[in-house]
Curated annotation (Swiss-Prot):
The gene is trpF. It catalyses: N-(5-phospho-beta-D-ribosyl)anthranilate = 1-(2-carboxyphenylamino)-1-deoxy-D-ribulose 5-phosphate. GO terms for biological process: L-tryptophan biosynthetic process. Gene3D superfamilies: Aldolase class I. This is N-(5'-phosphoribosyl)anthranilate isomerase.
Amino acid sequence: MSAVRSKICGITRIEDALAAAEAGADAIGLVFYPKSPRAVTVLQARAIIAALPPFITTVGLFVNASRCELNETLDAVALDMLQFHGDETPDECDGYHRPYIKALRVKAGDDIAQVCRTYRNARGVLLDTYVEGVPGGTGETFDWALIPDDLDKPVILAGGLTSANVAQAIAQVRPYAVDVSGGVEKSKGIKDREKILAFMSAVHGT
């Protein structure tokens, strides 16, 4: 099995982005959802991206944003990839000249495989915990046994991951990548360098 990739999401500070890069993260997530405590402004995002070393993918997270809002952000911020974390339809995810991943909030009874096929142009699916009224960042895990073995897209596993459970998650789910936010924080939006290092060490098995 190839190495599992990783994204540290909800970055709001330059020092946290650099800590993620130094620890070996492949990507950082920048939240453009004003209701989130981890939201960043265009100016914050530009400063964070400008400080990054090479080969760190920048992912912009959006929740039910209008096409106008998204295009304005993309005109101002050099994002490599988009993450749609709301109720966006496949058509609403297309047309931005950026690769995208679609977040799915998992609950019992969902036909995850069918939903994945619906988002035919998605580069991958991010599987997160379903909590009613909360689009993401719940800090809670879900039953990984609900994930089908035959998904036709790379799986990015999210939802309540920490340094204490990510190795087990990787062994059980065998995802393409893992995504963490709250599991490496001091408080919402403020990352903890030691927690980032511990998480990445667990991901890499070192």
